[in-house]
Structures are given as structure tokens and as C-alpha cells.
Amino acid sequence: SIMNKRFLSKKVQWITAIFITHLMFIVTCLDVLAHNPHDPVLGLGISPNFVNDKTLFVATYGELTDWSYPDIMRSTNGGLTWTRLPNGMDNRGKFSSIRVSPNFSSDNTVFVTTLGTGPGVYKSTNRGNSWQPFNTGLLNRHVTELKIARSGATDYVLFLAPGGGELYRSSSTQANWSIVLEPSSAMISVIAVSPDFMQDSTVIVARTTGNLLISTDGGTQWNDKGIPAGAIIYDITIAPGN
């Protein structure tokens, strides 16, 4: 009948409108997700010469959005566009931090740390174009924190905390890691290196219990300052000249 034809026509129009609306929503979402990096950023590394080279590195966690695997990305135009840098990362796991050498302009070196069953540390000496595991001597490869500081005109020192409460040290002149704080039931939650490390060799670490440990000889000897009353330490910054 005429009434049935009109009803069917309106029903088809209604279904078509719903389909187009959903299609537009999907396309819009794809456009949004196409802007990389769109995943949660777990680490940020900035070139010390950013003013001139506009170079940034980010570590993303794509598994949270089910869109991609964890990635290391680089931008050389201040973040306008990004390039994935997976070459050599056979077992990426979940990234925890990314650090750029203080001598990046000359040594092109970048470090990335991983959690879980990954290699612990990846190192690149060509601005992220390729990576190699850097974990000789590293017994615990669940790395939660890594800090880097200039230790000479062309040298740097690295301090690394895995999940077992110990602290490791390495440097630009070493190919391995060595323990400078023994394992403990209290994990290391924060590492801070002095901005004047070349002069004062100062490193401060905080444990999950609140204990502060200070070294003024680059991590060889440590002074436990105890637990600040009622303190939960989330971060430490050392002022220049102190």
C-alpha cells in the first residue's frame, strides 16, 4: 500500500542516516589517531642543542590504545612530524625512560630503558636510527629510572635503578654496568644528579621508604640521611651551585 511504501522509505532513510553518522564518526576517529604520536607518552628526551637542531625523542605505549606496539619516535622539527625508530629493537617490551647524551651534538647518543622482560637498556650512537642492547653487567633488567650527567668535556656518567633496590653506574668510557648500591627491599624511587656534576660529583637517591642517600664522589660512597618525618618523596631537583 501507499502507507507501507512511505513507511519503508522513511525507514531506509533513517537507517542510511545512522550508517552515515557512524561512518563519519569512524573516519573522524581514524583522522585523530593518525596524528602520531597519539599514544600515551612514557618518556621524553630533548636534545641539549634543541634551539638549533629541533630534535625530540618520545617513548610511547601503544598497547594502552590497542593501536600499535610501544614505539620510540624522533622529531627533527620541534614536534611537527615524527619518525618511528624500531631498527634493532627486537624485544621492546614497555619503555620506562629515554635520555639524550649531554654531548648529543657530537656523539649522537641516546638511551632507552625498558620494563619487564626487555633488554633493560637500548643505546643508539646514530641519533636513534639503530639500537643495540646496552646491558652487560645488568643483572636486573626491569629498569624504572635512568639519569645521565656530563662528567667531562666529552664524557658523561649514567645512573640506573632497576626493580630490586640496587643502583648501577656506567659511563661514556665503559661498556658495562657496575653496582654502586646493593639490592634492598626498598626500591629506589628517585635519582637526581647535580647540574654541576662535573665539579661536585653529587648524586641523590630516594627509596620508597623515604630514605635519602647522598654521594659526593660520583656514587662510590653513600651517606644515608634517614627518613624525613612524614615524607613521601616523588621527585628531587638539585639547584645549581648547591
Please identify what each model-predicted range represents.
Residues 7, 14-25, 29-242:
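Extracellular glycan-interacting surfaces
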